[in-house]
Amino acid sequence: MFLLTLKDRKDDGAYAVQNRHGDKVLFLFEEEDDAVRYALQLEEQEDTEMEVVEVDGELAIKTCKLYNYKYAVITPNDIVIPPKLNDNFSKN
């Protein structure tokens, strides 16, 4: 699996998105191509360089569960795009 970090700042942790409830969700991509595509969209939108990092999927999921982090496994059949900056989600 693959996740995203800020380029040259892996120690700052993985990139996560905020869901409509305000919780951060870590995206774990099954395919590197999908992670790269998402990273390019982020770079264009946020003017920040991202890096795609390969991780052991089972270990990443176990770690998320251990620390009660939310995560989503992004399969090749999923379509995800970065949320626009300052997007407001309906609380309903």
Give the residues covered by each predicted segment.
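Conserved NAD+-utilizing ADP-ribose enzyme module
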Residues: 1-92
